[in-house]
Amino acid sequence: MTQKLAILGGDPVRTRPWPEWPHVGPEDVDRLRTVIESRNLGGIPFPNTMHQQFAERFTAKLGAKYGLLATNGTVTLSMALRALGIHAGDEVITTAFTWVGTVAGIVHVNAVPVLADISDDNWCIDPVKVEEAITDRTRAIMVVHLGNQVADMDALLDICRRHNLLLIEDCAHAHFAEWRGRCVGTIGDAGSYSFETSKIMTSGEGGFLVTATEEAFHRAMSLAHVGRKEAPYDRFPGRVFGWNHRATEMQAAVLLGQLDRYDALDKQRTAMAEMLTQGLVEIGGFKPLAEDPRVTRRQRYELLFRFDTEAWDGLHRDKVLEAILAEGVEFEGNTFYPPMHRDELFHITADDWPAIRERYGEKIEPDAFHLPVAERVAFDEAVWIHHSLLSVEPEDVQDMLDAVVKVRDNLGALKKSL
């Protein structure tokens, strides 16, 4: 394939629009119409009718004991921490390679985030670095199951048992992924899921909390319900000062449809991911991450590849992805997740969050951390392929592969243009 690259003025491989996300059907419109015509749109009574339907079904599909739908995935992380007894000044160790919402969930309860580096194998938090980060103020680990990966839960559970720490799972990317046959989110003390607009299941915004502990669940219900302590969700001591994080009936109505079509879309994504992965391996230059056999079901919110700069004649990832994008195919790099401590959104000051002062002073500065793997992966190696590019047909996957081949076949021209 020697056609002129689109980035140099040629015609792109792909000009047709990609399938739209999210998938919406007439049954979704009917369900929303039912809500609107009922005039019962909000979060009261709590939990409301469709809220309760979705919560029961989603919790059961996960194999969890208790589950709560809330306004978004960041607040369900905060609710999990507070419901489990995390207080101001407690340190929570989390990954350096994540969205800012993970850290916000910690900071918003006035706890202290501690970033640990990632494993080079799966780009999730490195258990060795977690153990090195533990102090006498550490109370919890917040693990993120990233992209299409699952963190090493065996090692993290062992650390938590030996050090008497809580384990909270951020499953924003990992709805129904499994570790040794158990859904992630149900393995630690609590799990949190996101239904933000880009996620595999979406209601525009939304979050979900699961736990196996009745007391923590009831406390979380109170936290979401402005601190009300009402039967039958009142089996916890004392009171909490809550928020209003009640999900609306409209969010729940949309999510019921998302859940109905989940398995069919997952089957399609899996087949297209396998086709795309095989094709990229044959082309060269994009290496899939190793697959841990303990991950018994893998999700594909983002398909992750390691960019091999040598295979691209020394060109940096970002220049290659720019050329592929010009061909009509969006593979993302550093624009998806920079390392957390280098993210412009990572702006945490003691004026706003005084609990950080003892460890960090007046502001958490980027140089408070040494995170070489996260920096290398984020700035040079990580390639992210969004699940919307997997909810497609084989001819669409072929367009992706053709775009990559075209750029590979025209590397010389691309290098000369720099």
UniProtKB/Swiss-Prot annotation:
- In the Enzyme Commission scheme, what number(s) does this protein have? 2.6.1.101
| Gene Ontology biological-process annotations | antibiotic biosynthetic process; polysaccharide biosynthetic process
Q: List the disulfide bonds.
A: none
Q: Which Pfam families match?
A: DegT_DnrJ_EryC1 (PF01041)
What cofactor is needed? pyridoxal 5'-phosphate
Write out the entry's keywords from A to Z. Aminotransferase, Antibiotic biosynthesis, Pyridoxal phosphate, Transferase
Q: Which GO molecular function terms does the record list?
A: pyridoxal phosphate binding; transaminase activity
Cite the annotated pathway: Metabolic intermediate biosynthesis; 2-deoxystreptamine biosynthesis; 2-deoxystreptamine from D-glucose 6-phosphate: step 4/4; Antibiotic biosynthesis; gentamicin biosynthesis
Which Gene3D superfamilies does this one have? Aspartate Aminotransferase, domain 1 (3.90.1150.10), Type I PLP-dependent aspartate aminotransferase-like (Major domain) (3.40.640.10)
PTM-bearing positions, type N6-(pyridoxal phosphate)lysine: 199
Is the keyword Ribosomal protein assigned to this protein? no
Q: Which InterPro entries match?
A: DegT/StrS_aminotransferase, PyrdxlP-dep_Trfase, PyrdxlP-dep_Trfase_major, PyrdxlP-dep_Trfase_small
Reaction equations catalysed:
3-amino-2,3-dideoxy-scyllo-inosose + L-glutamine = 2-deoxystreptamine + 2-oxoglutaramate
The answer to whether keyword Ion transport applies is no
Task performed by this protein: Catalyzes the transamination of 3-amino-2,3-dideoxy-scyllo-inosose (amino-DOI) into 2-deoxystreptamine (DOS).
**PANTHER family under this entry?**
DTDP-4-AMINO-4,6-DIDEOXYGALACTOSE TRANSAMINASE (PTHR30244:SF34), TRANSAMINASE (PTHR30244)
Q: Family assignment?
A: Belongs to the DegT/DnrJ/EryC1 family. L-glutamine:2-deoxy-scyllo-inosose/scyllo-inosose aminotransferase subfamily.
Put simply, this protein is called Putative L-glutamine:3-amino-2,3-dideoxy-scyllo-inosose aminotransferase
Taxon lineage? Bacteria, Bacillati, Actinomycetota, Actinomycetes, Micromonosporales
